[in-house]
């Protein structure tokens, strides 16, 4: 889950309104304004006829303008973290935050057909972009540990940072693994994340983070369905 709920943000002002009828009416008025005032009422009457060739040209012009505005909106959104997707988000993450999309599962060319690599989701990459600012400090904030844990390996999914009140410097960093059956992290992944959190430039000198896997609770539901 991202540290910011993008759905609560208002639509950016640079996103243009897409209203065909409004554009079409603007086109008609601009066309009429090209003629002397004595002829404008005549043209206004002519343009009420759907079959008139000039109306058809203005309709096409308005539709092309609608498509152009839609493309401008898409281009603008591709530059915003809240909206960018796919390769647009890759470029934004690299140029603005210095991050690249991590691999969850490497490609396997030994099978037929070859299995392509699986990369982290757009949502996860957005979260790392937001958390990257917390990663610039070594004050030991929970979000800083989240950032470094997520960046350690693309398989890291959920993260919970906790400490006891009487020993706040002893931290448990509990992780889940995205590609495991029950979410439990493997020993290999735990070791990778632990190595990422141990360096002095990552944690305060007094912090002792310990990475652990979450524990899965198996349960069975018995239900009676009435139809």
What role is predicted for each listed range?
Residues 134-227:
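Carbohydrate-recognition loop of C-type lectin domains
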